[in-house]
């Protein structure tokens, strides 16, 4: 029996989104033992219970107010919203935070030997997909008539099997499309994982836990987006160095022993450091450049 005073978080039970969700919560300092076949688990150090379900069940559990919080892909969320609108079901939820994983896109793809100029080439085509409502929304917006072939998996084999003329499926790298003789021609929806919660009363105890969780998630994401930079820079080029690094705050400047022309600079950079940036730092006279990951960060 799940105690009502625990914050109930629901997330995908399998696949990569599940692993990324567990990793995020672990980085937030929440201790939990979620084994592969264990679908319910209690946090050891916070009043939280985790429930693992199929990803397409998560939006409904939130919208119906059965659980408090969910981690879900925006593609699944929006598909369920459109589906529930047709059934006149409740679609209320609050999006608390867009997360930094689960990046993918829902795209149209056609066989390599098929000619494509624009979306009108697919007029009156049969499209295989697991996302019929998102597909219909996009085609209706573009005044395209189509016939759908609903598949819950292996969508990419549909054209070769003679089931469809094209497909509408999730794409991450495009390798699966290429392996099945398909090419991506149009992105119709871009998606990331997001944190959502139910609309309605949440007890003050649960609200406090949720606020703590949100603060920690923000800290984890900010840390992953930032780097700690240490370098030596000429005093006369200091402002140019600072402008190049886009620091979250002004840098810490330290004197160097026995050198009046250079200083040591420490700062948190809010942008990813590419090799080109480091090479430009070198051109400005910087040396001993160190770029370090940040484990945790709180502003």
Curated annotation (Swiss-Prot):
Pathway where this protein functions: Amino-acid biosynthesis; L-histidine biosynthesis; L-histidine from 5-phospho-alpha-D-ribose 1-diphosphate: step 1/9
Enzymatic reactions: 1-(5-phospho-beta-D-ribosyl)-ATP + diphosphate = 5-phospho-alpha-D-ribose 1-diphosphate + ATP
Principal location class: cytoplasm
Protein localization: Cytoplasm
Gene3D superfamilies hit by this protein: 3.30.70.120, Periplasmic binding protein-like II
Record-stated family: Belongs to the ATP phosphoribosyltransferase family. Long subfamily.
Annotated protein name in UniProt: ATP phosphoribosyltransferase
Organism: Buchnera aphidicola subsp. Schlechtendalia chinensis
Lineage: Bacteria, Pseudomonadati, Pseudomonadota, Gammaproteobacteria, Enterobacterales
């Amino acid at each position: 029996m799940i105690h009502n005073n625990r914050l109930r978080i629901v997330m995908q039970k399998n696949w990569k989104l599940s692993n990324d969700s567990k990793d995020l919560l672990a980085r937030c300092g929440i201790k939990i033992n979620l084994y592969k076949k264990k679908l319910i688990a209690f946090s050891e150090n916070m009043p939280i219970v985790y429930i693992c379900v199929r990803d397409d069940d998560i939006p409904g559990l939130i919208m119906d107010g059965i659980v408090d919080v969910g981690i879900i892909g925006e593609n699944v969320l929006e598909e369920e919203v459109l589906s529930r609108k047709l059934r006149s079901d409740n679609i209320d939820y609050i999006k608390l935070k867009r997360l930094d994983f689960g990046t993918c896109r829902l795209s149209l793809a056609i066989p390599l030997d098929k000619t494509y100029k624009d979306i009108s080439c697919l007029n009156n085509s049969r499209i295989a997909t697991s996302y019929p409502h998102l597909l219909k929304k996009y085609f209706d917006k573009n005044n395209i008539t189509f016939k759908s072939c609903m598949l819950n998996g292996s969508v990419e084999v549909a054209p070769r099997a003679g089931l469809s003329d094209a497909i509408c499926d999730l794409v991450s790298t495009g390798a699966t499309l290429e392996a099945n003789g398909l090419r991506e021609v149009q992105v119709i929806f871009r998606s990331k994982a997001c944190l959502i919660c139910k609309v309605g009363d949440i007890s003050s105890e649960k609200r406090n836990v949720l606020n703590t969780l949100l603060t920690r998630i923000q800290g984890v994401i900010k840390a992953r987006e930032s780097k700690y930079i240490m370098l030596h820079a000429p005093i006369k080029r200091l402002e140019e160095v600072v402008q190049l690094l886009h620091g979250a705050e002004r840098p810490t400047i330290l004197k160097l022993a026995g050198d009046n022309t250079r200083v040591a600079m420490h700062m948190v950079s809010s942008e990813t450091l590419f090799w080109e940036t480091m090479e430009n730092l070198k051109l400005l006279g910087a040396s001993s450049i160190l770029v370090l990951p940040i484990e945790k960060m709180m502003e």
